C-alpha cells in the first residue's frame, strides 16, 4: 500500500523561498506520521518546479514562470515516469498534494492572472492534472486523521457497536480514540479513577482533529452531549452518527443544540 505525494511533504526545502510556515511543517509531519502509523509507503513525485527553475527559486505562478515549451516537455517526461511507477506498482491510494502550488495543488492553484481572472483559481495544479484518474487529497486534509469517538458505552450492544464503528474508521486510516478502551467501561471506580478518566478523555478530545458522536435514542447520552459541546467550543468539527428513527420533535431529530453543533 502506497501513496504518491508532493516531494516537498518529505523535503520542505524544495519549496519556493519564504512560503513555508511552521503550520506547513506541522502538516507535513502529521502526514508522515499517519502514513507510518498505518504502514503506508510514501512515494514522492518528481518536483517539476525544482527541476526546471533550480533550488532557491522565488514564488511565482504558472503563467509567470512555467508557461514555456521547455517546461511542458519536462512535464511530459515526468508524467511518463510516474505512469510507469503506477503501472508497475498498481494504483496508489491517492496523491497527497499541496494546495496553492502551481504544479501540485489539489483544489486550488496559483495558475496566474488572465482575462480578468485572479492568479489563484480552483482546480489541480498543472502537474497533478496529468493524473485525473488518481484521487488527490490536500496535505491539510490528509493530516487530519485523529478521531475521538463519543458514544454511550453502558451496554454490551453499545460497546459492540462502538467497536465496529472504530474498526470501520481504522480501515480508512483514521486513528480512533475509544473511551471504553481507556477503562471507562465499569461502575467500579473511585474518585481518583474518575478524575483520571476525565482528564485522559478531555486531553484526547483536545488532541483530536474531529469528533464522531453517536447520538441514538430520543434523548442523547449526557456524556456524549458534553463531549460534543466541548469539541464545538474548541472549534473542532463534529460529525453526528444516528441510526435511530425516533425524533425529539417535528423539526429536530435530537436536541437542537446537538443537531446544530454537528
Where are these regions (language model features)?
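Extreme N-terminal starter segment of soluble prokaryotic enzymes
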Residues: 1-3, 145-146
Amino acid at each position: 500500500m502506497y501513496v504518491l505525494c508532493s516531494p516537498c511533504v518529505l523535503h520542505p526545502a524544495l519549496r519556493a523561498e519564504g512560503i513555508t510556515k511552521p503550520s506547513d511543517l506541522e502538516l507535513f509531519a502529521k502526514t508522515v506520521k499517519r502514513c507510518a502509523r498505518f504502514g503506508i509507503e510514501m512515494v514522492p513525485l518528481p518536483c517539476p518546479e525544482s527541476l526546471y527553475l533550480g533550488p532557491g527559486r522565488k514564488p511565482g505562478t504558472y503563467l509567470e514562470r512555467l508557461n514555456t515549451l521547455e517546461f511542458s516537455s519536462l512535464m511530459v517526461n515526468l508524467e511518463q515516469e510516474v505512469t510507469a511507477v503506477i503501472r508497475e506498482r498498481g494504483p496508489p491510494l491517492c496523491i497527497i498534494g499541496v494546495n496553492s502550488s502551481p504544479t501540485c495543488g489539489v483544489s486550488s492553484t496559483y495558475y496566474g492572472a488572465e482575462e480578468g481572472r485572479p492568479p489563484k483559481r480552483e482546480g489541480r495544479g498543472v502537474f497533478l492534472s496529468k493524473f485525473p484518474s488518481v484521487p488527490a487529497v490536500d496535505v491539510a486534509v490528509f493530516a487530519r486523521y485523529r478521531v475521538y469517538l463519543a458514544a454511550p458505552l453502558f451496554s454490551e450492544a453499545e460497546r459492540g457497536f462502538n467497536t465496529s464503528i472504530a474498526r470501520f474508521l481504522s480501515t480508512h486510516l483514521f486513528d480512533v480514540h475509544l473511551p471504553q478502551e481507556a477503562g471507562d467501561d465499569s461502575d467500579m471506580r473511585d474518585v481518583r479513577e474518575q478524575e483520571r478518566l476525565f482528564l485522559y478523555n478531555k486531553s484526547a478530545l483536545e488532541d483530536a482533529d474531529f469528533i464522531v458522536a453517536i447520538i441514538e435514542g430520543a434523548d442523547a447520552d449526557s456524556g456524549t452531549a458534553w463531549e460534543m459541546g466541548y469539541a464545538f467550543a474548541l472549534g473542532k468539527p463534529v460529525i453526528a452518527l444516528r441510526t435511530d428513527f425516533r425524533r425529539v420533535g417535528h423539526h429536530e431529530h435530537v436536541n437542537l443544540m446537538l443537531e446544530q453543533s454537528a
